[in-house]
């Protein structure tokens, strides 16, 4: 059913005039998530009680999801630590819809990662699908063409009954929406852990490309300019959706009752909306633009007005509806998908509407910019909102939540994995390799990723088997980008500061192994309840670790997202800071793949230092269900050096393949690279080395590289000159169909592939 415009109201409307004369009328502020003191502050701001519509507007905009009221005091540290040198290539940063970075030759890239965790548990398909749609619109709002997506997924234990429901819906939602948009999914992670059983994480990243002169920002400027709402009609779906779902914890009784709060997406509407926006930008028809996501029009109007140089008047009855009888508060706070709001000069309105008609996109003038400082919203001539917009969008409550190192932290850190029995014989080491490879933690993700289109649009250079996704940006010069996202809740649980830096280091390294230069960071910080001092300690430590790490690497945080209340009852998830890193390649033809066997008889070399580090490792998890001790040491100066060597080696043709070492250590990296290249190899461990430590340690800052035989001497000299440890550990044998660890064990590629690829189909097929 479509309804437009709305008919005159048949029920009494709570107007500003009425609110001023009924100061004692009870209002359900608590049911809307507002605290007593927050409600009193709204009354002080307005000098009266809020109308029902104003109350709804403040409640969604002052929610944890929209206002960052518990995290803002800590997030400021990102800005405080970012130097002018780090900002040099940043065209838009924290506070905008997405960060934008100069990548050279007049090109810019915008990228951001956001969460849609809570909706994806309540209704996995639509929760995940609209998570993709929302982050894509953030990228569109910067003036860019979206070119790729990635995802970071966390589910409960792989064999838990509800994991099948959630995983199936989430994967179908991501694939269904992204594939329909024609956007390649170029990477990500899927992790299983019991702590995510009631709180899955669905963090979606989108990357967009634009010419620097096409950059657009969200602001309403110029009195008399028109406000145009365009895209899908507005309905009841998503009322109080992500803004409310993401601002509370779940319990077993109410999670399924929250279904109506999950938005419903239409990827085909979004696809034409993308093309419509790009034509509007190309025609110079847009002054400012804002996508409609969490909190809907309440967010878009207040943010546009507060970022501009005037006020705004909106006629809410002009909003095209698809549901009859909606109240002003429902229209204002609906989170219906595939909608955008633009500021357009009067002389360009007709041209703007004509472009929208061409693309069959519904567009309606709903208001104008004023020369005042108020946001006024009317409903059939009656004023239902009259507020200072900054108090809604930017001046909400800010809390310095109590934080405290958990009493259990010392015991957790003292419980080292060193006490666990270790494999020693060749047979035991072989069994360990197969146990890790055949676990849900390290097995092939092909069952999931094959549901995504990785190469649509034809610009994907690396995706399958790659540490970082690589995209071509400029067909003429070959300029391109590499992106990666990483996280480790287990390491962050052991040490939040170091855990965040380890996630940053791995994402940075995953970009570096493609041959790209890392240039910028985005993040999505997933934690439990901010009302728990232990959670806030984890959060504060992780923020400082990430910010300090970025300073050490010389790359800025361009934006991000915080997701709190990821817990069921008192049980929080593992603290999970997701870090995305963007890198630049001058020529994508020189990118480094993961697969071995590109050159006959390649030499395998291990870069970096291997230490006895197993606390928080997958080995400890799989063999003993153990989590304790201290995470691996992180050396960001060494990470930076490693990236410089890989970039130079890629440029000079000294390396033919590279693969990051992370979970599962060297053994897992060798297996993945051999399977990717469908070639055998022989590994020769150093004589004085402990085979178990060499094969399975998860020490950071290490990369497996394949070096053409003719370039081994030059590459070794390059590493020696720069002080980077480089050890020859074997050769690629294209005539072999086995991975051999000399003197210890041999495993056929067929057995490795079967072990790895059979796990997820058996669990979820």
Swiss-Prot record:
Please tell me where substrate binds in this chain: 115-118, 137, 263, 335-337, 563
Query: Where would you say this protein principally sits, based on its record?
Result: cytoplasm
List the SUPFAM superfamilies. Answer: PurM C-terminal domain-like (SSF56042), PurM N-terminal domain-like (SSF55326)
Gene Ontology MF terms in the entry: ATP binding; magnesium ion binding; phosphoribosylformylglycinamidine synthase activity
Q: Name one GO biological process term.
A: 'de novo' IMP biosynthetic process
The UniProt entry annotates the active site at 65, 116
The UniProt transmembrane annotation reads none
Question: What keywords appear on the UniProt entry?
Answer: ATP-binding, Cytoplasm, Ligase, Magnesium, Metal-binding, Nucleotide-binding, Purine biosynthesis
State where the protein is found.
Answer: Cytoplasm
Give me the Gene Ontology terms describing cellular component.
cytoplasm
Annotated binding of ATP, by residue: 68, 112, 523, 560
Among CDD domains, the record links this protein to: PurL_repeat1, PurL_repeat2
Q: Which InterPro entries does the UniProt entry name for this protein?
A: PRibForGlyAmidine_synth_PurL (IPR010074), PurL_linker (IPR041609), PurM-like_C_dom (IPR010918), PurM-like_C_sf (IPR036676), PurM-like_N (IPR016188), PurM-like_N_sf (IPR036921)
**Which residues take part in binding Mg(2+) 1?**
114, 561
Q: Where is the composition biased (Polar residues)?
A: 1-13
The entry marks the following residues as binding Mg(2+) 2, namely 138, 291
- Reaction(s) catalyzed by this protein? N(2)-formyl-N(1)-(5-phospho-beta-D-ribosyl)glycinamide + L-glutamine + ATP + H2O = 2-formamido-N(1)-(5-O-phospho-beta-D-ribosyl)acetamidine + L-glutamate + ADP + phosphate + H(+)
Among its keywords, does the record have ATP-binding? yes
Checking Pfam families in the record gives:
AIRS, AIRS_C, FGAR-AT_linker
- Family label: Belongs to the FGAMS family.
Role according to the record: Part of the phosphoribosylformylglycinamidine synthase complex involved in the purines biosynthetic pathway. Catalyzes the ATP-dependent conversion of formylglycinamide ribonucleotide (FGAR) and glutamine to yield formylglycinamidine ribonucleotide (FGAM) and glutamate. The FGAM synthase complex is composed of three subunits. PurQ produces an ammonia molecule by converting glutamine to glutamate. PurL transfers the ammonia molecule to FGAR to form FGAM in an ATP-dependent manner.
Q: What is this protein called?
A: Phosphoribosylformylglycinamidine synthase subunit PurL
Q: Which organism is it from?
A: Mycobacterium avium (strain 104)
Q: Which gene encodes it?
A: purL
